Amino acid sequence: MYYFGYCTWLDDVEIKRFMPAATPVTKGYAANHELRFHAAGERTDRGWCHFSNTAEAWGKKALGVVFEHDPKHFEEDYDDFERCCVTVYGDDGKTYDCWTYRLITPGIAMRPPNFYWEHIPTGMKQWNFPEEYIAQVQAVFDAAAPCPRADRPNPSAIPGRSAASR
């Protein structure tokens, strides 16, 4: 089974926290998708990554990494997120039937807290994503409303399912 990591889980530290035995297969992209940052629904306490495929994403590519993993992870639910299926075009020339998480109801455009955000540019650099793409993601981040408590600490060293524990 394949997971498409496009946001915080690009950082080796984060993917290992949530899927310790996941193995990277290839870098790739999801056509007509883009990485956005939004609050969850009506909440305004923080932003999260969102894997958008609305009209604004037409013609864009969300870059990421295909990870092979134990199927048990497909059953893991997190507050405010749903699993979605996506075809990923791998840099190895193959296509992959993947799944990933996205917000169920994206609210206003809002930045995530710093502890969360830092995994994104770190991961993109670890995977040698193009500087142009990294700058594009930075611009999306900069255009979003500030996180009310951007400096809040990571609430848990051990990931939980509830929004309060992440």
Regions found by a protein language model. Give the residues of each.
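Glycine-aromatic micro-motifs
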Residues: 1-166
